[in-house]
């Protein structure tokens, strides 16, 4: 995800979501599968993950990170599996919204650039068709060159920001969030209301987010200060509040030590970066299956890019073959960015 974020920043700062105090993005799993930790024997994150299971073709989930500055997320509908008839993609991650600081009101909030906001505002056109096919829609949250970030919020600020994330998910009927600790301008010493950036502070935010919306997905990038949450938060291990940990490109080591209690089903391995031509080998994909891991990620898939036929499409066919034992069907009806 690195290197594709600076372009978000300039427009983001002029498009801060002032409505944050009220709405937010996701209604996915919770609305379709109202599993609650209060009336279920499974943990909140197990409930969220259970809502994903059963709407997809296999236990291995394919995450597609869509660079919405350039790409229409509806392109994820172009790919199905021949035998099952189900979508290749299980989760679409909108890359990316941001975390920013409002100095006038001394609060941290979610900010969206015009591209992200257009998709959210017009969710009926761009997001609902994905969800109608059983694809979950997740909002990425990324640092944006100011004092606030994923990894430096005090407990009070983490609780408040988690509530804002819930509001956003509810407002836009989204299915969860993804935390990426990059591009923040952390300050030393930390200003009032912030703490020294740390994995523990990032874990606190993930924990508070799961507390605020237990039936939504909380996912993290295995990178920077979200790369491991080894210390329990209020006595709770990471596996109880992180649904999926998504490896950096090519990463394939087991994450049990990084996130105590996280099942293999929540580990997303051997990620690919399509824009840079960083593709996974057949063996890497087979290892996901044979070792019992739960996910795989592709970044920057776009049928309108020049390397689609030569690189992206063969990589997608290999995913269908190795992860699902199936054949890819490409509809050959790419969606352009029409906003």
Curated annotation (Swiss-Prot):
Predominant location category: secreted
Location of the active site: 182 (proton donor)
Catalytic reactions of this protein: an N(4)-(oligosaccharide-(1->3)-[oligosaccharide-(1->6)]-beta-D-Man-(1->4)-beta-D-GlcNAc-(1->4)-alpha-D-GlcNAc)-L-asparaginyl-[protein] + H2O = an oligosaccharide-(1->3)-[oligosaccharide-(1->6)]-beta-D-Man-(1->4)-D-GlcNAc + N(4)-(N-acetyl-beta-D-glucosaminyl)-L-asparaginyl-[protein]
Domain GH18: 60-326
GO BP annotations, alphabetical order: carbohydrate metabolic process
Source organism superkingdom: Bacteria
GO CC entries: extracellular region
Enzyme class at the top of the EC tree: hydrolase
Signal peptide: 1-50
Residue stretches spanning the membrane: none
Keyword annotations of the record: Glycosidase, Hydrolase, Secreted, Signal
EC number: 3.2.1.96
Propeptide: 339
GO molecular function, one term: mannosyl-glycoprotein endo-beta-N-acetylglucosaminidase activity
InterPro entries tied to this protein: Endo-Fsp, Glyco_hydro18_cat, Glycoside_hydrolase_SF
Subcellular localization(s) per the UniProt record: Secreted
This protein's record includes keyword Secreted: yes
UniProt-listed Pfam families: Glyco_hydro_18
Family: Belongs to the glycosyl hydrolase 18 family.
Primary role: Endohydrolysis of the di-N-acetylchitobiosyl unit in high-mannose glycopeptides and glycoproteins. Does not hydrolyze complex bi- or triantennary glycans. The presence of a core-bound fucose impedes endo F1 hydrolysis.
Complex and partners: Monomer.
Protein name, UniProt field: Endo-beta-N-acetylglucosaminidase F1
Organism from which the protein derives: Elizabethkingia meningoseptica
């Amino acid at each position: 995800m690195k290197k594709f974020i600076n372009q978000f920043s300039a427009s983001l700062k002029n498009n801060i979501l002032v409505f944050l105090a009220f709405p937010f993005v996701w209604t996915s799993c919770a609305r379709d599968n109202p599993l609650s930790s209060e009336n279920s024997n499974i943990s909140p994150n197990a409930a969220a993950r259970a809502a994903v299971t059963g709407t997809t073709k296999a236990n291995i989930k394919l995450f597609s990170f869509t660079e919405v500055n350039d790409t229409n997320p509806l392109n994820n509908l172009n790919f199905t599996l021949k035998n099952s008839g189900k979508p290749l993609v299980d989760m679409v991650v909108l890359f990316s919204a941001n975390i920013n600081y409002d100095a006038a009101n001394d609060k941290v909030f979610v900010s969206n650039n015009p591209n992200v906001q257009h998709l959210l505002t017009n969710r009926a056109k761009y997001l609902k068709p994905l969800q109608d096919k059983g694809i979950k829609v997740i909002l990425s949250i990324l640092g944006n060159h100011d004092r606030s970030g994923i990894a430096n919020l005090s407990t009070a600020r983490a609780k408040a920001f988690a509530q804002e994330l819930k509001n956003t998910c509810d407002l836009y009927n989204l299915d969860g969030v993804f935390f990426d600790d990059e591009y923040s301008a952390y300050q030393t010493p930390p200003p009032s209301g912030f703490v020294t950036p740390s994995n523990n502070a990032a874990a606190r935010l993930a924990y508070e987010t799961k507390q605020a919306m237990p039936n939504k997905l909380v996912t993290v990038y295995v990178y920077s200060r979200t790369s491991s949450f080894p210390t329990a938060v209020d006595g709770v291990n990471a596996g109880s509040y992180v649904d999926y940990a998504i490896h950096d490109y090519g990463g394939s080591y087991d994450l049990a030590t990084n996130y105590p209690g996280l099942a293999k089903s929540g580990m997303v391995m051997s990620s690919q970066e399509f824009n840079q031509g960083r593709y996974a080998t057949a063996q890497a994909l087979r290892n996901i299956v044979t070792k019992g891991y739960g996910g795989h990620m592709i970044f920057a898939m776009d049928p309108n890019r020049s390397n689609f036929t030569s690189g992206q499409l063969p990589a997608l066919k290999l995913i269908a073959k190795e992860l699902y034992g199936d054949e890819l069907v490409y509809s050959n009806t790419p969606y352009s960015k029409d906003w």
